[in-house]
Regions:
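Conserved beta-strand/short-helix segments
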Residues: 1-245
Length: 245
C-alpha cells in the first residue's frame, strides 16, 4: 500500500560536495537498519579529486553487498569525462573490485546515471553529453560488474542534444534496460522519449517502439525505473505542465 519500503539490507547515500579529499570530491556512506536505527556499514568511501562529484548516482545490488558509484565530473580520461567505480562488501569492508570505468571523451559526464542489476551482475552507465550520435546526443554502456568489461555495443542517442542516458534502470537479472532521453524531440521540442532494450545472443536490441512524452517541453525520461521482472516501467516528466509520471 506504499507505506513500507524495502531497500535490501543497506542504503547508500551520496554526498557530492564533501571536501574530504578536495572541494567537491564527494563521498558515499552505507547504512544498515537495525533495532537501534540506521548504523553505518564500513568506512566512508571518498571521491578521488576536486570537483569529481563522486556519489552523484549510487546503486546497490538487492542483497546490499555490491555498490556502484558515479563521479560524472572526474577528469582521469579527460576534463569531466566522468567515471564509475564498483565495490564489494566483505568482512574487511568496502573494496573496489575492478579498474575505474572511465568516460570516453571530454565533457561526456559518464556516470551521470548508473544502475546496477539487482543480482549485481551488470551495470548500465549513462553519459548524457557524449557526442557519438551528434553533439550531446548521449550514450549508454553496459558492463559486467565483476570484471568491468563491456557487454554488447554502445547504445547511442538518436540525434544531437537528446541527452540519451540521462536516466537508466535495470531489471533484476540485467537482461532488460530502460534508458531515458528527455530532450528527444519526437512529439515536440524536448518532449522526451524512453527506450527499452533486451540483451539476447550477445547484443542489445530495442523492445518495441520508443515511449514518447506527450508534448513539447515535457522532458519525459528524466527519471526512469523498471521493475525487477522488466515488464513495467515508470517514467517521470518534470517539464509537463501538470508534472506527471
Amino acid at each position: 500500500d506504499g507505506t513500507r519500503i524495502a531497500i535490501g539490507e543497506e542504503t547508500a547515500l551520496g554526498s557530492q560536495n564533501v571536501k574530504i579529499n578536495a572541494r567537491g570530491s564527494g563521498q558515499v556512506r552505507i547504512f544498515d537498519y537495525s533495532e537501534s536505527g540506521w548504523v553505518q556499514v564500513g568506512s566512508n568511501i571518498d571521491g578521488e579529486g576536486a570537483g569529481d562529484l563522486f556519489g552523484w548516482p549510487v546503486s546497490l545490488s538487492s542483497d546490499g553487498t555490491r555498490l556502484v558509484v558515479g563521479a560524472d565530473d572526474n577528469d582521469d580520461k579527460a576534463t569531466n569525462a566522468g567515471h564509475v567505480r564498483v565495490y564489494d562488501y566483505t568482512a574487511s569492508g568496502w573494496s573496489q573490485i575492478c579498474s575505474d570505468i572511465d568516460g570516453e571523451a571530454e565533457a561526456d559526464k559518464s556516470g551521470f546515471s548508473a544502475s546496477l542489476a539487482g543480482d549485481g551482475t551488470r551495470i548500465a552507465i549513462g553519459a548524457k553529453y557524449n557526442d557519438d550520435g551528434g553533439n550531446n546526443s548521449g550514450h549508454v554502456r553496459v558492463y559486467e560488474a565483476s570484471s568491468c568489461s563491456q557487454v554488447g555495443a554502445d547504445l547511442d542517442g538518436a540525434t544531437a542534444d537528446d541527452n540519451f542516458g540521462y536516466s537508466v534502470s535495470f531489471s533484476d537479472d540485467g537482461s532488460i534496460l530502460a534508458v531515458g532521453s528527455p530532450n528527444f524531440d519526437g512529439n515536440g521540442s524536448n518532449a522526451g522519449r524512453v527506450y527499452i532494450y533486451e540483451f539476447s545472443n550477445g547484443s542489445w536490441s530495442q523492445v518495441g517502439s520508443g515511449i514518447d512524452g506527450g508534448t513539447a517541453g515535457d522532458t519525459f525520461g528524466q527519471a526512469v525505473s523498471i521493475n525487477s521482472a522488466g515488464d513495467r516501467v515508470a517514467v517521470g516528466a518534470p517539464g509537463n505542465g501538470a508534472g506527471h509520471v
